[in-house]
């Protein structure tokens, strides 16, 4: 047999038919073969911890281009100048399930964008639904655990999730989205992304606005029913990733129109809901009909152009955080956002190590000499009125986590608007999906679910009850 040569991680060559150094017969191979130890130790350590949430994902490279002048509302270099282009990388993901789970499962989807700006990296951490389940960050671990497999059997247990929902009514708005066909939008190219949180855009004179940005897919929505999604998951667990990469290979580059909603801090207390409550959406004109419309203003377009060459190095090692902001952007007082400012970097230190920002995927693309572009000195932030200060204090009060009427109003209006917005079949699909889930829980829990749904609408509770009990029987 001809001798072969292999190279260890140190770069040294080893020869021999079995790619091992020549042995002293009196010693074991492990005693002498440092290369074998090297190979095995590298294999044992080659995987890193998966993300606590958003573990399953896919990513691609693209660019953001400014298409509209927004210099009157922001002082963000990346957004100043029509035609300006900024390179970016985007990672799509499922949320609660593990890295090997099917992408078509009923789940909230993530869309995180890292912009490599001249001011440093600016991360947009978005979901495909414009709100979240909870507004009290202390509930987050329990909320995630409730959607994970039962710790006793490691099998999905819907009772855990419905128990959480029935005890935390602020979840109802997003639960309605989750169990509609919005929850089985498995095609990454066709899903939109919403920041969900309010941020602040600050001008050089210290004035500022609350803003919420979102990305509307130019491919249009692509919904599947629960039955179709289940079949897709059985046939191809990586369906969304495959679709994304194959479209890029064909030269079909997906794009998103980026828009921003703007609220003056003096107007925020006058709105009939709190824009710092992430369980509510900023009304674009769909619902509720009696709540102020906050129109979207077009900023630009994001287009994906190519996939990664090394998924682990370029996508898996990406570290996103809502705390990664640039000049002219600040976080709002939203408690969930404030918690995420800590939680994301902390999770990345555990997953990728304390120097995760030095990894190639996360390095800034600033000037080569390390200098920052000159920026005008920003004036101190202008202090809004006492009315605004009193309004902000609501998020720090003990009543912030308690249910209020808007927790039922928003899901109620969503339910009523579905036939108009998406059709009767879309509304009926929500009932079917809920019934299939609720039918798997004990009788006492089912009654609790029906009572909770009745707080939204009697006809919703009645329809879910009827179909659920038919399935059970």
Curated annotation (Swiss-Prot):
Enzyme class: oxidoreductase
Segments crossing the lipid bilayer: none
Region spans: Disordered: 1-31, 352-389
Co-factor(s): heme
Assigned keywords, A-Z: Alkaloid metabolism, Heme, Hydrogen peroxide, Iron, Metal-binding, Oxidoreductase, Peroxidase
UniProt keyword annotation of Zinc-finger present: no
Residues involved in heme binding: 344
PROSITE patterns xref list: CATALASE_1 (PS00437), CATALASE_2 (PS00438), CATALASE_3 (PS51402)
Role this protein plays: Catalase; part of the gene cluster that mediates the biosynthesis of fungal ergot alkaloid. DmaW catalyzes the first step of ergot alkaloid biosynthesis by condensing dimethylallyl diphosphate (DMAP) and tryptophan to form 4-dimethylallyl-L-tryptophan. The second step is catalyzed by the methyltransferase easF that methylates 4-dimethylallyl-L-tryptophan in the presence of S-adenosyl-L-methionine, resulting in the formation of 4-dimethylallyl-L-abrine.
The protein, known as: Catalase easC
Originating organism: Claviceps purpurea (strain 20.1) (Ergot fungus)
Classification of source organism: Eukaryota, Fungi, Dikarya, Ascomycota, Pezizomycotina
């Amino acid at each position: 047999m001809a001798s072969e040569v292999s190279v260890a991680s140190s770069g040294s060559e080893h020869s021999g038919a079995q790619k091992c150094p020549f042995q002293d017969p009196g010693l074991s191979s492990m005693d002498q073969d440092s290369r074998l130890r090297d190979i095995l130790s590298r294999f044992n350590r080659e995987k890193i911890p998966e993300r606590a949430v958003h573990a399953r994902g896919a990513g691609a490279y693209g660019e953001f281009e400014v298409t509209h002048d927004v210099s009157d509302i922001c002082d963000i270099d990346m957004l100043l100048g029509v035609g300006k282009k900024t390179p970016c990388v985007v990672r799509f993901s499922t949320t609660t399930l593990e890295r090997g789970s099917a992408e078509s499962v009923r789940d909230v989807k993530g869309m995180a964008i890292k912009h490599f700006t001249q001011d440093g990296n600016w991360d947009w951490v978005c979901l495909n639904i414009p709100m979240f389940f909870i507004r009290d960050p202390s509930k987050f671990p329990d909320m995630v655990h409730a959607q994970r497999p039962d710790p006793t059997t490691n099998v999905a247990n819907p009772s855990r999730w419905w128990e959480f929902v029935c005890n935390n009514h602020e979840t109802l708005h997003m639960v309605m989205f989750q169990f509609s066909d919005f929850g089985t939008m498995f095609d990454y190219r066709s899903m939109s992304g919403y920041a969900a949180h309010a941020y602040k855009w600050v001008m050089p004179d210290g004035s500022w606005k609350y803003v919420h940005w979102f990305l509307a897919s130019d491919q249009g929505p692509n919904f599947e029913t629960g039955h179709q999604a289940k079949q897709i998951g059985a046939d191809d667990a990586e369906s969304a990733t495959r679709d994304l990469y194959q479209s890029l290979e064909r030269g079909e580059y997906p794009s998103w129109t980026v828009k921003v909603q703007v609220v003056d801090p003096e107007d925020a207390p006058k709105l009939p809901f709190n824009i710092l409550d992430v369980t509510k959406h900023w009304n674009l004109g769909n619902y509720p009909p009696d709540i102020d419309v906050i129109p979207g203003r077009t900023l630009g377009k994001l287009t994906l152009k190519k996939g990664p060459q090394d998924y682990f190095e370029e996508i898996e090692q990406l570290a996103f955080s809502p705390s990664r902001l640039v000049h002219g952007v600040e976080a709002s007082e939203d408690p969930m956002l404030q918690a995420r400012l800590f939680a994301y970097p902390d999770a990345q230190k555990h997953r990728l190590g304390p120097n995760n920002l030095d990894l190639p995927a996360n390095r800034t693309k600033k000037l080569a000499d390390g200098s920052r572009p000159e920026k005008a000195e920003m004036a101190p932030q202008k202090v809004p009125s006492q009315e605004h200060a009193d309004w902000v204090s609501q998020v720090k009060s003990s009543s912030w986590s308690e249910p209020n009427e808007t927790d039922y109003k928003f899901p109620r209006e969503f339910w009523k608007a579905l036939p108009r917005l998406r059709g009767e079949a879309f509304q009926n699909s929500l009932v079917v999906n809920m019934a299939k889930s609720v039918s798997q829980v004990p009788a006492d829990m089912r009654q609790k679910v029906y009572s909770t749904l009745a707080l939204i609408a009697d006809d919703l509770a009645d329809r879910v009850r009827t179909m659920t009990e038919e399935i059970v029987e």
